[in-house]
Structures are given as C-alpha cells and as structure tokens.
C-alpha cells in the first residue's frame, strides 16, 4: 500500500533511509521536517513494514509549482515504481505541474526513465588550462 507517512512511521522511515543512504538521523529528520514537510513524505508499506520511502519537496520554477523527488530509498523495482507513481499522481492532484529528480545511481536513473522521467541536463567536465594566479 502506498500512502503518506504517519507520525508512527517515522522511526521505520529513518531506519530505512539510514540503511539505504547512510545519512544521519538528524539529517533525515531535518529533511522530512524542514525540507519537504511531513505532509510530503510518501511510503510503501507491505505486510505491516515500511519497504520504501520518498520525499516530494515543494519547489517553484519560473512561477510554476512542482516538486523535487528526494530521498528515494527501498528495495525492489516494482515497489519503488509504484511509490513514484503514487507520489507523482498525488502531487499532480495538489497542483504540481512537474516533478524533478536527481538519481543517486544508474539503477535509480533507469527506474525513473522507465516511469517517464527524461534527462534534462547532465554534469560535464570541461578541461581547461589552469594558470597560477600569484603575482
């Protein structure tokens, strides 16, 4: 079942996030409370356990409301795909015109691409000569 996180789910979400991403509990709680807001944390529950989680951080781009998919964690591509679908659909109902994401691995990038996300830009390295700037 995909749904919004309830306060009673917080410890399980923090534990899952720490296991998957290695962040501190302080960082995770700050992300949920101050970055996304508790009302924008989505979870996938299976057999009474939290199996996946993601934040839908509210953003505005050139006056258009949308969200930033952040902290996607969990195992199983079907569970993660369902969570992304639910998050995007619910945010669209709330008026979000777009969802952006920065995948943390090639596997996550492939999952998001399968869900219709497109690469908008990529980081690239431009080599150039560096001169000492001592005078």
Regions found by a protein language model. Give the residues of each.
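A short, internal acetyl-CoA/4′-phosphopantetheine-binding micro-motif in the GNAT/acyltransferase core
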Residues: 68-79
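Short amphipathic alpha-helix that is part of the acyltransferase structural core
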Residues: 1-26
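A conserved short alpha-helix in the GNAT/GCN5 acetyltransferase fold that borders
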Residues: 83-92, 109, 113
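Conserved beta-strand in the GNAT
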Residues: 43, 49-59, 68
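Conserved GNAT acetyl-CoA-binding A-motif
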Residues: 91-104
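Conserved catalytic-core motifs of GNAT/GCN5-like acyltransferases
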Residues: 61, 102-103, 118-134
